[in-house]
């Protein structure tokens, strides 16, 4: 099992074609895409990060394959998402920002799978124009804030809302159809208009209290000064660096809350996988974890993403394929892979 230069979206789309050729007695593979936000390649224990706690995603890597050199083609939220859904570069899919891509829906992986009899759902962040709810059997899109007002009038965290909706999808899906669910988290994206930026759930605040998160060797004024002249103090990446990282105290506060959000996403991924196991379908489900782009943690004197440094374009990719030989479980693939 080697993905090599086969890209993620086209890999998913191939599942649809393969199901048509399967014998009637075989069960088509379900597809679960766990799609995080602003999460770079090394925000995983499995990737060697000794501070962030991601036990459920680490376990997923132990049961599948982790791709160490996976990159997005464009490190911009909406564009990167369009590339994943369509399997096409920005120059072909027509999305140059946050608009709806021009590629026909039937050519996207949700479209292909639904056309082939799948029960298809999307939960969480969309970010490509108006959410096309009519194209999904189960569609709930929301983003932009860490806290929402719930049905009972109480506040609910966006990651908890993601979890509730994902479990509802799995518990209410028709048992006689395969499913494809894209669970698109808003965390670990910052709430840009909020002074605290990263707002985890109260129970997570005890995490990372007693650690000091190291600052990268290239998170220096010298690294900033080496950038081309069009990187000035008006640059949005530099502006957001001031929001988040321009003092040692601010860096520690922001990074700890960022990691808390990551651990919450990890927990929700685990709850969803537990439900699949409870239903007896985990070993008939292709599970993919990846993200829309990386993230500067003050490297080069920047924050956020957008530019072609590894911190910005290199993202995690874990694939758990039940057809994978057991000897491949827990392996890594160092081939160059892309999100288109």
Residue ranges and their predicted role:
Residues 46-51, 65-88, 99-102, 122-132, ...:
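Short, solvent-exposed turn/loop segments enriched in Gly/Ser/Thr/Pro and often Arg
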Residues 2-17:
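Bacterial N-terminal signal peptides
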Residues 83-174, 187, 191-201:
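Catalytic-site neighborhoods of secreted/periplasmic enzymes
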Residues 65, 118, 281:
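Short phosphate-binding/catalytic loops that engage adenosine nucleotides
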Residues 26-29, 38-51, 145-157, 171-177, ...:
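Active-site-proximal cap/lid insertion segments
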Residues 22-65, 74, 97, 114:
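Active-site-proximal N-terminal segment of extracellular/periplasmic enzymes that hydrolyze or transfer
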Residues 30, 51-62, 66, 80-83, ...:
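Extracytoplasmic/secreted proteins, especially bacterial periplasmic and envelope-associated proteins
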């Amino acid at each position: 099992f080697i993905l090599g230069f086969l890209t993620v979206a086209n890999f998913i789309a191939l599942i649809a074609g393969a199901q048509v050729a399967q014998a009637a007695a075989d069960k088509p593979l379900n597809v679960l895409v766990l799609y995080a936000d602003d999460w770079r390649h090394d925000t995983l224990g499995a990737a060697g990060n000794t501070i962030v706690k991601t036990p459920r995603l680490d376990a997923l890597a132990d049961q599948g394959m982790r791709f160490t050199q996976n990159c997005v083609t464009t490190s911009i939220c909406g564009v990167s998402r369009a590339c994943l859904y369509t399997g096409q570069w920005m120059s072909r899919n027509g999305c140059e920002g946050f608009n709806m891509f021009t590629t026909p829906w039937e050519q996207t992986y949700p479209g292909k799978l639904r056309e082939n009899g799948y029960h298809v759902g999307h939960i969480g962040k969309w970010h490509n124009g108006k959410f096309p709810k009519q194209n999904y059997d189960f569609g709930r899109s929301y983003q932009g804030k860490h806290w929402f007002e719930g049905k009972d009038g109480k506040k609910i965290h966006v990651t908890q809302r993601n979890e509730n909706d994902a479990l509802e999808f799995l518990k209410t899906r028709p048992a006689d159809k395969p499913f494809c669910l894209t669970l698109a988290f808003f965390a670990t994206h910052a709430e840009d208009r909020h002074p605290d930026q990263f707002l985890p759930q109260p129970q997570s605040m005890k995490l990372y209290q007693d650690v000091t998160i190291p600052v990268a060797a290239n998170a220096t004024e010298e690294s900033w000064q080496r950038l081309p002249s069009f990187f000035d103090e008006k640059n949005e990446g530099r502006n957001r660096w001031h929001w988040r990282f321009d003092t040692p105290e601010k860096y520690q506060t922001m990074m700890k809350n960022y990691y808390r959000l990551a651990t919450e996403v990890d927990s929700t991924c685990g709850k969803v996988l537990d439900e699949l196991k409870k239903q007896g379908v985990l070993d008939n489900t292709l599970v993919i974890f990846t993200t829309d782009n990386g993230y500067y943690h003050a490297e080069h004197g920047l924050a956020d993403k957008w530019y072609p440094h590894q911190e910005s374009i290199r993202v995690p990719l874990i694939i758990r394929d039940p057809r994978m030989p057991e000897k491949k479980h827990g392996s890594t693939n160092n081939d160059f892979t892309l999100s288109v």
